């Protein structure tokens, strides 16, 4: 397994993304990016709290599956609710993660952190972000995404203390040993297409080149995890 990670501040005053890479007691590999929500307070703390609570819960379950991942996110959601009440604030995070055990992957997300599964530069699967624009497209309320460009950052699900908004998206697959998983915050996928991303990854020092040419001057924080086999 080959792992790369990258995070940066962009043009923001602080980095409110949090990367968690660790191993569960079961032997599964755990990868997560939590993105503190813009417009809320203490996003860096929220991202850390969410990540730590999800990992801690899953570290002690007998098996990793959709139900237990949802329970882990609910635990994190409760922790954020308590944090918000204690500090009299609104805070929260969006998440995207991959848990790998043997040749099975569990992909999960809440909000607009995206996860891709790649095979030989072909996208086998990509998450569909929980955003207002996607909800309107699915309901046929709008025909073209560009008509709601200014609303693309509004998420419909998050880990922010509201149980009704923290339902995960989930995808599980048995993968081959030449697969690649990519997790990235919206500061990345709103800046560069997956096709451009893959072109850079195929080059020497690709992820660093990607940062220097595209990401350092973005308006948002940016975070990436790549997991290759």
Where are these regions (language model features)?
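PP2C/PPM-type serine/threonine phosphatase catalytic domain
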Residues: 1-229
């Amino acid at each position: 397994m080959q792992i790369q990670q990258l995070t940066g501040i962009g043009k923001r005053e602080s980095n409110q993304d949090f990367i968690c890479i660790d191993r569960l007691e079961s032997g599964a590999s755990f990868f997560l990016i939590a993105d503190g929500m813009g417009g809320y307070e203490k996003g860096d703390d929220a991202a850390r709290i969410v990540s730590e609570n999800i990992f801690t819960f899953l570290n002690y379950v007998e098996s990793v599956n959709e139900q237990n991942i949802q329970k882990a996110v609910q635990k994190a959601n409760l922790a954020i609710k308590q944090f918000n009440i204690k500090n009299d604030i609104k805070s929260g995070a969006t998440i995207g993660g991959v848990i790998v055990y043997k040749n099975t992957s569990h992909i999960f997300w809440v909000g607009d952190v995206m996860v891709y599964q790649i095979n030989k530069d072909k996208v086998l699967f990509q998450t569909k972000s929980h955003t207002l624009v996607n909800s309107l497209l699915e309901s046929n309320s709008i025909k073209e995404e560009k008509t709601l460009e200014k609303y693309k950052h509004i998420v419909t699900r998050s880990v922010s203390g509201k149980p009704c908004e923290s339902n995960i998206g989930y995808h599980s697959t048995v993968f081959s040993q030449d697969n690649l998983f990519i997790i990235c915050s919206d500061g990345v996928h709103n800046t560069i297409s997956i096709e451009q991303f893959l072109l850079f990854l195929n080059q020497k020092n690709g992820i660093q080149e990607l940062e220097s040419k595209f990401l350092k001057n973005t308006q948002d924080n940016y975070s990436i995890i790549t997991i290759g086999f």
